[in-house]
Amino acid sequence: MPSFDIVSEIDTVELRNAVDNANRELSTRFDFRNVNASFELVEENVKVSAEGEFQLKQMRDILRSHLAKRNIDANAMDAKNPEATGKNWHQNIAFRQGIDTPTAKKLVKLIKDAKLKVQASIQGDKVRVTGKKRDDLQATIAAIREAEMGIPFQYNNFRD
């Protein structure tokens, strides 16, 4: 019976590359000359530091563009509120990985409401979908992509 898994993961190597490229762009941009600004990757969180809140916003946009170039969905970013410490501003950006239980339940409900001949089951931080025909599984993937749940999903472990 054909099946596949729905997961939400981020390639940490690509994330590190995106942060390094964003730091490199900061060093060459004219509006960040003589400004103490940097991106710092700590595990799966990015710490953004700059001298002003406006610069933090610009830096988030720089990071977003480099994530897109590296095929990391920017919807996985969870930006916390900026904090002012002295003359510097800091912001932590966490990257969501895995599918939490409420989202998994919404996903299963979405699949069941689509009235496709597939079964969905929650298995930890992923959802397994099984069906009799490969076409049903592909229709399920299309329905999930249409739904826009705010979390980037990847489809892997496709078995026939």
Curated annotation (Swiss-Prot):
| Keywords per UniProt | Nucleotide-binding
Q: Which GO terms describe its cellular component?
A: cytosol
A UniProt-annotated Pfam family: DUF520
**What are the protein's GO molecular function terms?**
nucleotide binding
InterPro entries noted in UniProt: DUF520, UPF0234-like_C, UPF0234_N, YajQ-like_sf
Output the CDD domains linked to this UniProt entry. YajQ_like
What highest taxon heads this organism's lineage? Bacteria
Per the entry, what this protein does is: Nucleotide-binding protein.
Query: Record's family?
Result: Belongs to the YajQ family.
Q: Which HAMAP family match?
A: YajQ
NCBIfam families reported in the protein's UniProt record: PRK05412.1 (NF003819)
Q: From the Swiss-Prot or TrEMBL record, give the protein name.
A: Nucleotide-binding protein VIBHAR_02358
The source organism is: Vibrio campbellii (strain ATCC BAA-1116)
